[in-house]
Amino acid sequence: MSTGTVVQVIGAVVDVEFPQDAVPQVYDALKITGEGSCNGLVLEVQQQLGGGVVRTIAMGTSDGLRRGLEVVNSGSPISVPVGTATLGRIMNVLGDPIDEAGAIGEEERYVIHRSAPSYEEQSNTTELLETGIKVIDLVCPFAKGGKVGLFGGAGVGKTVNMMELINNIAKAHSGLSVFAGVGERTREGNDFYYEMKDSGVLDKVAMVYGQMNEPPGNRLRVALTGLTMAEKFRDEGRDVLLFVDNIYRYTLAGTEVSALLGRMPSAVGYQPTLAEEMGVLQERITSTKTGSITSVQAVYVPADDLTDPSPATTFAHLDATVVLSRQIASLGIYPAVDPLDSTSRQLDPLVVGQEHYDVANGVQTVLQRYKELKDIIAILGMDELSDEDKMTVSRARKIERFLSQPFHVAEVFTGSPGKYVSLKDTIRGFKGILSGEFDHIPEQAFYMVGSIDEAVEKANKKK
């Protein structure tokens, strides 16, 4: 183990000088030794500048760091605990416990920089994963072992949707989950921990947090820490759920690190290595012949612009995209999923079956027609429409309201109990609305209910 000294500190970027014959490799973890608040601070090598000097990024706060401090090279990249010992625990980017519940007591550690599985090892599956959320199961069904993105601007419900998915899938699926909190609010991490504890699934979840107040190096690597833990479970032959909230903060941390390292920015100020950094992470989130990783990633959309380079780069890697719309949220329809913008590779008659495909297609057709008629209604009013168009509008408004659903995780705010709707009930409900079976029921009855039977019951009560 070679030792060096700190020669320059600029914020989170630290230059360290080593003897010429013992220069650390890129991604090696270095540790600061000696007195003071920085004792034990981990640095990750990013560049070799020549002359024995390496440029590193600090994985913690660099307050109190000064020139001349001694640095020890660990000789390998950052490694984190893996295996069942991590379940029920909250860890940071280095795998250290931050839940005040003692040491992890792991039997094995993995380095966080690993290569993706080869083509021969990867498996292809078309098994569906039921979420219990009507709009998702109908329009953008998830595949087991697939990648899902929840796209949305600020405050349209990405985290609430993700919490509901964890609540529904983690409980029903009874598999293991890994939650990586990347650059999000500490309060949300705290809420998530107690939510899991109260629902009794804490012993099946490993949590890794690198919150908003952490330095960029920490936020850039915390997603890899969570992924490494999920990979271990997958390689043991288990089916794992990996939740990442929020993948945009991973990109943003990369932008900060890139700027600190002096790289020339690319479009909209993002790092020139954006596509490669995203690829390195996403290519590792895959299912092998041994086990599967099903990942759900929240993607913040800056200024609600889906063409922004960050969400646009993420799109390419996903099997299903759930787009949350501010317009739908403003109508009071939650989850605010846009059924016309959301997509899934699984929505294919060969995968979901002909009936499901036809119903989903019918719902989208009716909603699209209603969207086109909105301008005419705004100018001329409903009376000018043909009888057929009036029928379309009436059914579309019922469908819109029926796409809403009370969530278990939002019971505290809404006061109404959450509903889990099976795929069979979802298809039956929408098929009935499209066929005109429920034309006699007022549209208000479809708002915030679970299955179609509840809507009928609600309408009968109002009579």
Swiss-Prot record:
CDD domains assigned: ATP-synt_F1_beta_C, ATP-synt_F1_beta_N, F1-ATPase_beta_CD
SMART domains (UniProt xref): AAA (SM00382)
Catalysis: reaction(s): ATP + H2O + 4 H(+)(in) = ADP + phosphate + 5 H(+)(out)
The keyword Ion transport is annotated on this UniProt entry: yes
Gene Ontology molecular function terms on file: ATP binding; ATP hydrolysis activity; proton-transporting ATP synthase activity, rotational mechanism
Residues annotated to bind ATP: G152, G153, A154, G155, V156, G157, K158, T159
Membrane topology: Peripheral membrane protein
Its EC number(s): 7.1.2.2
Subcellular location: Cell inner membrane
Iron found in the keyword field: no
Superkingdom, natural source: Bacteria
Classification via Gene3D superfamilies: 2.40.10.170, Bovine Mitochondrial F1-atpase, Atp Synthase Beta Chain, Chain D, domain 3, P-loop containing nucleotide triphosphate hydrolases
One GO CC annotation: plasma membrane
Keywords: ATP synthesis, ATP-binding, Cell inner membrane, Cell membrane, CF(1), Hydrogen ion transport, Ion transport, Membrane, Nucleotide-binding, Translocase, Transport
PANTHER family assigned: ATP SYNTHASE, ATP SYNTHASE SUBUNIT BETA, MITOCHONDRIAL
Subunit structure: F-type ATPases have 2 components, CF(1) - the catalytic core - and CF(0) - the membrane proton channel. CF(1) has five subunits: alpha(3), beta(3), gamma(1), delta(1), epsilon(1). CF(0) has three main subunits: a(1), b(2) and c(9-12). The alpha and beta chains form an alternating ring which encloses part of the gamma chain. CF(1) is attached to CF(0) by a central stalk formed by the gamma and epsilon chains, while a peripheral stalk is formed by the delta and b chains.
Membership in a protein family: Belongs to the ATPase alpha/beta chains family.
Function: Produces ATP from ADP in the presence of a proton gradient across the membrane. The catalytic sites are hosted primarily by the beta subunits.
Protein name, per record: ATP synthase subunit beta
Gene symbol of the encoding locus: atpD
